[in-house]
Amino acid sequence: MKQLQVLLVAGTHGNEINGIWLFDEWKKSSFLINTHGIKTFKVIGNPEAKKAGKRYIHHDLNRSFKEESFIKINPLNCERTRASELVNLYGEAGENPCQIALDFHTTTASMGSCIVVYGRRDADLALASLIQNQLGLPVYLHESDQKQTGFLVESWPCGLVVEIGPIGQGLLNSRIISQTKLILETLMEQIHEVKNLNLFFPNKLIIHRHIKSIDFPRDEEGNIDGYVHSLRQSKDWQELKKNDELFCKLNGEIIRFEEDEPYIPVFINEAAYVEKNIAMSFTKRELWNFKKEWKQALIDLIHQK
């Protein structure tokens, strides 16, 4: 049986420094975080961007994990080269193969703490269920968006993203650091419980399923000519109903939510998403029954069956 190994990543975006700082302190004092004896690799995702104090150098690292990127490595593209390096080092067939990847991020949006799952892989949903059951975190299921692909955790058999906010880029914050530490330790504890078959899975999982993303209002030249309405700003996870305010223009014009069914907005006014033409994303809150296939997939993965 292969040894269970977990990849822990901070600084996938170089200006999200709270996880990086926590990892640096952890390396100085190994007792700071309890990994329950599980072998972990603590990695700074994008060290070049960290040095530069930027989100990325050439291309968003968290959109660079695509098969074609690994086949045709561009030495002039820092992030695609780094994605290939990480997979070669820690991927399933890498030098230090890890079964689970946990990627720690921060956001400028008022998201609080949440888990992001990409697609519907059974092991991901099982682990997300465990952490939601322990900490009550919302789970954002990101899928069916062809404009946003190539996420880091998708290159591992099981992987979750942790998002914590709000926090400005390049700033340290005690609450963000404490939340990161708490979630990391809880995840490691739950993985340990699965390893020892001493676990309790919930019957339900609350999912916020991605529907679509919307852009800011723009003029004929493509420039942003409106901003998030004051009644919508910082209202992540709060239900949007028809005719609710979305955006406002300086002339007083209000752009309203026009969908017939209610949605839950997330990542409202996230600073890093402006370049991606995303003002916010819409989700639908759903209550899913926990499936035994999820549980078995996670157990089999951790026990290398």
Swiss-Prot record:
Q: What does the record give under GO molecular function?
A: aspartoacylase activity; hydrolase activity, acting on ester bonds; zinc ion binding
The UniProt catalytic activity note for this protein reads: an N-acyl-L-aspartate + H2O = a carboxylate + L-aspartate
Write down what this protein is called. Answer: Probable aspartoacylase
Q: Which InterPro entries match?
A: AspA/AstE_fam, Aspartoacylase, AstE_AspA_cat, Aste_AspA_hybrid_dom
- Going by the record, the broad EC class of this enzyme is hydrolase
Q: Where does Zn(2+) bind?
A: 13, 16, 105
| Transmembrane segment boundaries | none
Domain of life assignment? Bacteria
